[in-house]
């Protein structure tokens, strides 16, 4: 089914405020909401929400209701998104990525693997996480560092996407890993990636929204929890996430802009874990707490 977006065109300050209003309206639901700079000189920004055609009337009404008080005369525009696999298209020709001892590469770059690399083969596809984004690469580097310092007895990869982080843990240490994602397609792709990378066993792949699954009680508590999601849901889930952490365990968080770092750290300090280290990559941060 094709996708479309509703969007507004405003200044940067207004765009950020609209983003907050739409996030309040749709924050608990699975809609992508984003701001994009269109014209730097004229300070024109677009704030967009992406949806499917069959949701059009309901979502437009909710967008208008969310904005009417503070932006009563602001037009909400509509655009159909071309039916193109943008993930695969944008990642064509990407070179291998090194992060710690890991080398993440596509199947076309197998010849780039060195004898001592911990190689992970991930092709562009339907799930996030090929190592090229600063958040994924930062997590891989932090996993290498944390596991070197203290071998975990088990691990949780929350929001596994392509499965690259769960696969990385298994390549470092032979311990059980629970990998979950809200998207069943991502879970299927991740499981296939695990088999392709020589770890068909030892990773339990589960479809689970947030912590709403019996799997967390079944396999936890965890010595290592990794969550590469986004700052807002990470902050919201802080108390619940920490309840699944074993005493002395480590938390690795990413999907966080550098400007959001202290807010996330504060949320997790309040939940009982303290900041250990931060890695910066391309405007994104990966945080280790314990």
From Swiss-Prot:
Lineage top rank: taxon: Bacteria
Keywords, alphabetical: Cytoplasm, Methyltransferase, S-adenosyl-L-methionine, Transferase
Any coiled-coil regions, as ranges: none
Gene: prmA
Enzyme Commission (EC) number: 2.1.1.-
Reaction catalysis annotation: L-lysyl-[protein] + 3 S-adenosyl-L-methionine = N(6),N(6),N(6)-trimethyl-L-lysyl-[protein] + 3 S-adenosyl-L-homocysteine + 3 H(+)
Protein name: Ribosomal protein L11 methyltransferase
Family designation: Belongs to the methyltransferase superfamily. PrmA family.
Pfam families, per the entry: PrmA
Subcellular location: Cytoplasm
One example GO MF annotation: protein-lysine N-methyltransferase activity
Example of a GO biological process term: methylation
Record's function text: Methylates ribosomal protein L11.
InterPro entries reported in the protein's UniProt record: Ribosomal_L11_MeTrfase_PrmA (IPR050078), Ribosomal_PrmA_MeTrfase (IPR004498), SAM-dependent_MTases_sf (IPR029063)
Keyword RNA-binding applies: no
Residues reported in the UniProt entry to bind S-adenosyl-L-methionine: 136, 159, 181, 228
Entry's Gene Ontology cellular component terms: cytoplasm
């Amino acid at each position: 089914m094709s996708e479309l977006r509703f969007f507004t065109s405003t200044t940067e300050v207004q765009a950020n405020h609209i983003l907050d209003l739409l996030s309040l309206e749709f924050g608990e639901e699975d809609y992508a909401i984003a701001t994009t700079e269109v014209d730097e000189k004229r300070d024109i920004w677009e704030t967009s929400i992406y949806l499917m055609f069959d949701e059009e009337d309901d979502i437009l009404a909710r967008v208008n209701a969310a904005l009417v008080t503070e932006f009563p005369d602001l037009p909400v525009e509509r655009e159909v998104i071309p039916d193109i696999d943008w993930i695969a298209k944008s990642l064509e020709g990407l070179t291998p990525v090194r992060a710690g001892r890991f080398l993440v590469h596509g199947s076309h770059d197998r010849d780039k693997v060195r004898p001592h690399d911990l190689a992970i083969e991930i092709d562009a596809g339907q799930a996030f996480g090929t190592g090229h984004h600063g958040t994924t690469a930062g997590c891989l580097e932090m996993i290498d560092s944390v596991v070197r310092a203290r071998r975990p007895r088990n691990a949780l990869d929350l929001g596994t996407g392509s499965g690259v982080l769960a696969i990385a843990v298994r390549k470092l240490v032979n311990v059980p890993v629970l990998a979950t994602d809200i998207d069943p397609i991502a879970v299927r792709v991740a499981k296939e990636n695990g088999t392709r990378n020589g770890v068909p066993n030892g990773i339990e792949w589960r479809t689970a929204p947030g912590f709403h699954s019996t799997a967390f009680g079944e396999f936890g508590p965890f010595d290592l929890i990794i969550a590469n999601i986004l700052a807002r849901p990470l902050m919201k889930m802080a108390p619940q996430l920490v309840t699944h952490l074993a005493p002395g365990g480590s938390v690795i968080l990413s999907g966080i802009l550098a400007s959001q770092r202290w807010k996330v750290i504060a949320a997790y300090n309040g939940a009982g874990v303290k900041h250990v280290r931060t890695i910066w990559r391309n405007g994104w941060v990966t945080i280790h707490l314990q």
